[in-house]
Structure formats: C-alpha cells, structure tokens
Amino acid sequence: MTENRVVLALLILCIVGFEPSFIHGATDSSDTSALNIMFSSMNSPGQLSQWTASGGDPCGQNWKGITCSGSRVTQIKLPSLGLSGSLGFMLDKLTSVTEFDMSNNNLGGDLPYQLPPNLERLNLANNQFTGSAQYSISMMAPLKYLNLAHNQLKQLAIDFTKLTSLSILDLSSNAFIGSLPNTCSSLTSAKSIYLQNNQFSGTIDILATLPLENLNIANNRFTGWIPDSLKGINLQKDGNLLNSGPAPPPPPGTPPISKSSPTPKSGNRGNRSNGDSSNSKDSSKSGLGAGGVAGIVISLIVVTAVIAFFLIKRKRSKRSSSTDIEKTDNNINQPIILASNDFHQENKSVQNPPLVETKKLDTSLSMNLRPPPSERHKSFDDDDSTMRKPIVAKKAAVVVPSNVNTYTVSDLQVATNSFSVDNLLGEGTFGRVYRAQFEDGKVLAVKKIDSSALPTDTADDFTEIVSKIAHLDHENVTKLDGYCSEHGQHLVVYEFHRNGSLHDFLHLAEEESKPLIWNPRVKIALGTARALEYLHEVCSPSIVHKNIKSANILLDSELNPHLSDSGLASFLPTANELLNQNDEGYSAPETSMSGQYSLKSDVYSFGVVMLELLTGRKPFDSTRSRSEQSLVRWATPQLHDIDALGKMVDPALKGLYPVKSLSRFADVIALCVQPEPEFRPPMSEVVQALVVLVQRANMSKRTVGVGSGSSGVNDYM
C-alpha cells in the first residue's frame, strides 16, 4: 500500500509539474494558421524543418525563427535563409507580432496587403518584391523601424500620418517614382531616412521640418533648393539636380522672415503698431524714414486707382457679357449627357466653350489684384459656379455599370492565393495576369495594372477607364467581370478562357499535344478581325487597340477567339510610352518611328498575327539567323510565290490545308502588312475577305498537301 501511494504521488507531481509547460506551449490557432499559409506560400522550404503546412505548435515545438510570449507569436526572424515564394495572405492575424524580419532572401511577388498590424520593426530588405509599398503599413502606429531596401518596388502607397514613432526609414535601391508624399511631414521621430537609388522627383522641402540626423537621397531626380535645416546634418545628395546655393527670395509682397522675431500673425497687428510706436523715438532703429513713409503713401494711392479702374471695367464687362453667357449656357451644361450608359455616344457630348473660358480667365486675373468686398465676392462666385457646373457634373456622371462587380484587394488575394506564382497566367505590358478561383467555384482572370501604366493615384480616373471598357460588347471581345481600386492598387477582372492564348497554342504547346489545324486558324483570324472591326468601325469614337498580338487573343473551349486588353491601351495615359518600350515585332513601321498608334497600325499588327498563324513562327526570334529574325521581313517577299509559300507554312500542319485557301490567306496578309499605312485595308474589308475564304473552304471536298496529290482528310477543311 505504501509503495502504491508513493507511485500515485509521483504521478500527480509529474502531471502538475508538466501541465504549465503544456499550456504555455499551445499556440493560438490564428497564429498557427497564418504561419501554415506562410510556409506553403514560401514553397514549403526544407530550411524550416519544424514548420508544417497544416497544424503544429509553433510555440511549443520551437519552430525556427519564431519567438512566443504565452500562446502568442511575438517575433518572426528568418533572414538569409534563401527562402523563395511569397508571404501568404493571413499575416494580419498575427496581432501580437512586433518584429518581422525576412531580409536577405529570394521572396518575390507583391508585398502582401495584410501585414502584422502591430509591428515595431519590419525588415523585408534584399528580396525581389514588386508592385507597391502596401497601404497596410500606414496603419502600424507603433512602427519604429521600416526597411524595404533593395527590392523592385515602384509605388509608394504609404500614408505616413500615423507613423509618428518611425525612427529609421530605408526605401533605397528600388524603383520608386514621383514626388515624396506630403504625409512625410508627420515623421516627427525620424532620425535616419535612406531614399538613394530610386527615381523620386520634385523637391525635398517636405523633409525640412523633421529632426533628421542622416538623409541619403543620392541618385534620384530631385530638384529645387536644399532647405537650410538639412545642410547641417549628414546629407548625401549626389546624382540629383539640386541647387545647393541659397534659396531664392520670396515673391514680391511676401514679408521677410526675421530670425530675431517670429513672423507676425493676422491677429498681431496691435502689437506691431505698439512696437513701431515704441521705436519712433529712434528713427535709425525703426528703419523707416520720411522718404519711406512718402513711398508707402504714393504706392497706396496707385494701388487704389488700379483697383477702382478694374472694378469699373468689370461692371461694364459683366453687363456686356451677360447675353453671351446666356447664349452659351446650353453648351456648357451639355456634357451632363455623359451620364448616359451608351459608350458609343458618350464622347460626342463633350463641348468646348471657348468664349466662356476666356471670360473666366479675364475675371480671374482681375481677382488676383486684391481681396474683393464680400458682396462682390459672392456675386463672382455665383457666376463662376455656373461656368464650373458642367465639369463637376461630368465627373460625377462616371458610374460603372451595375453588371460590373466590385472586388476588394482581400477578395482577390484569397482567390489568387496571394497572387502566387502558381496562379500566374502571364505578364504583359500593363501588368501581370493571375488565375483566380473563388469560393463559389467561379474562375476568373485578374490583371494587376502596373503603377507605371496608371501613375495617377486617383480612383476616379481608373473608374472612368473601367466604365468605358465595361460598355464594350462583342462576342469576340473578352468581357469585363469586375474591378478593384483600393489603397493605390488597380485591378481588372475578366472572364477566364481555359485554352489560354493563341501564343501558347502556337509557340508553347508540347509536341505530343494536338496541333492547331488549318480551319481553326482561319476561324481565329476571322473572329479576331471581327473584334477589331467592332472597335474601329462600330464604337464611336473609334478605339485603337494598340496592343494586337497573339498573347492577347484568348481561346475558349471551342477555340473561338476573344481579344483581350480591348480599350485598355487606348484609355491608359502612359500606354504609348510603355508599348514602345516593349515592341515584340508587331509594331507598324510608322509606329516604330513616331511612337504614335492609329487604326492602320492595328491592321498591320493583325497582319503579323496572321503571319504567325500561317508560319507558326514568332514575330521576332533572336534564335534564328539574322535574315530570318524578323518575321515580316523574311515572309513578305514569299507571300506571292506559291512554291515558297508552301515551304514557309507551319510544319505542324503537316501539309494538310487547301492550297487555294492558303494563297488567299497570304493575299490578305500582304495587304495588312503594307509598309505605307494608306495602302492597308480597313478591317471591314479584311473581315469580308476572310468570310469568303471560310465559305469556300467549307465547300471544298479535298485537302492538298505540299508537293503531293489530293487527300481525303476532310477534317482539315
């Protein structure tokens, strides 16, 4: 009995002794889930042997790089481990994490929108992150240290208003563009800021009031003068267009700033008068002699006369112009028609009221001479608001059609697994496209508009673009499903086509897969031509696509073509510049020289796509011999030579095509790729030529191979 009691007592002691440790090691379920997803998003790296993709106990099992307090994760430190992939989409659940260090790895993609919200230290330096510095950083009020250096970030979407505790900010060696945000003035604890090796522009005046000790702005595009307050700190400024001399004098009429006394405010006139009175005993101290007084009196008389002259002139001009304003009032208000949902008519309603604008400019010039009396100010505002009314109404009229869905960044991150590489469908001129699968099973394609394509951070501008694209309605134009405009990010959501792009079919398909036979190629050419005909000749005003290429022709399950990016390049402000930088062999000669696009340049690009369908070759292929690298230069001389034409046909067709159909197809190509734009046909004529070709092909009963007799393989007709 005694022995049994001893054993029982020992068991109880063991249980009591181990229970606190067990409870201490149980990790909060939200923290565990966030780390599970983070592990999967980083491609389940072997370097993190204790980590798992589901379940586990990060605190109790001492996962590598994880520090806990109780059941909550408080620190994540995984620097210099060669980690790749992305960071997942549930980091915002880590509400107790105060330090997050993933520096010196190979992590890429966009920074996750959801980051731990209560961080004091965030270090993501020396990775491969792209896109923008996420807005969620703006909410981290406790943040003291932020390092995003040596990545490929382009847009600074951070609002610094709440980051009053931030002491060290390092954004160096990225691709940031534009001016520093005005909210930088809120960085009242900033000691060191590193902005070197970016493309920032504008002035650095916004940093003048900060308590900085170190500032590195080298190798940017800053202009203007260096504030005096920054000249006494550790400042590195080489590689800019800054003026290190004294700042220019203030504009005329601006009171000089005295170092000995602050600039008097509007309520200090009495004190100022007293000061002058007290100093009147010694005119040498006051600095105001009899000549100065006389000058001021004369100046006041002149200014009064000028004001009176303009008041009289303005009254007369108002009487004489009242009739004109009434006559033009209908034209001014006419842009309100833009509220109509008819995309094909919206731009026709825009009017230019030059007479009214001129009068508005004249009166505004007279206003700048002096503060007007209150009753006159009210009268002028009434007139001015009448003239401004059309502009305000026009902007307010931009409404996205009700059939277009609105998504949040969080929605799209979940659907794309935080825009993972596994869901990347392709990367084009204006951004990357991802496959998105939603909870209801629906699959869509999400295009993230690159900040360089839409540099303005104005949601209204993007909404206007979306509204215009949403009105495009044609069976061969990819349909817009929805959009997202949130925290400086702009995304468009399109219908998804499982067969991918024509480019993939022609150039990336595996040899054992079924090749694209002749009739589907003609069908794809005809459908794409009809899409362009719609944009060019049905839409009003006409829409120049600007980006016709095989990668933008998507194929559904029946190989029907759908032209993507329709209207996008036409409405984006920087499209021409971006397209010229990314020419892939589709650009017309005049576009390559001038950088300008037209309906006829679209026709040329379509001809290049037809050449791809005919030959199976890329528009430009550097792996081929120099004489064959440019598809147009190599193929054009052979289009009217039957023997040569047969030899340049895509070998994947294995000679199974109608010779007459092939010849007529080549004739259409030759017309489209004419060097002179005036000789290229309109798309309606191209459509008619291809319709006739398809009709004749369907009537044909045999297929002829190159250098062989007839064949009875009717499937290729």
Curated annotation (Swiss-Prot):
GO terms for cellular component: plasma membrane. Disruption phenotype: No visible phenotype. Residues 256-287 have a biased composition (Low complexity). The lineage of its organism: Eukaryota, Viridiplantae, Streptophyta, Embryophyta, Tracheophyta. Pfam families: LRR_1, LRR_8, LRRNT_2, PK_Tyr_Ser-Thr. The protein kinase domain is predicted to be catalytically inactive. This is Protein STRUBBELIG-RECEPTOR FAMILY 7. InterPro entries: Kinase-like_dom_sf, Leu-rich_rpt, LRR_dom_sf, LRR_N_plant-typ, PRK1-6/SRF4-like, Prot_kinase_dom, Protein_kinase_ATP_BS, Ser-Thr/Tyr_kinase_cat_dom. Expressed in seedlings, roots, stems, leaves, flowers and siliques. LRR repeats lie at residues 96-117, 118-139, 142-164, 165-187, 189-210, 211-232. The modification Phosphoserine is found at residue 379. It comes from Arabidopsis thaliana (Mouse-ear cress). Belongs to the protein kinase superfamily. Ser/Thr protein kinase family. Residues 313-717 are cytoplasmic. Residues 419-693 form the Protein kinase domain. Residues 26-291 are extracellular.
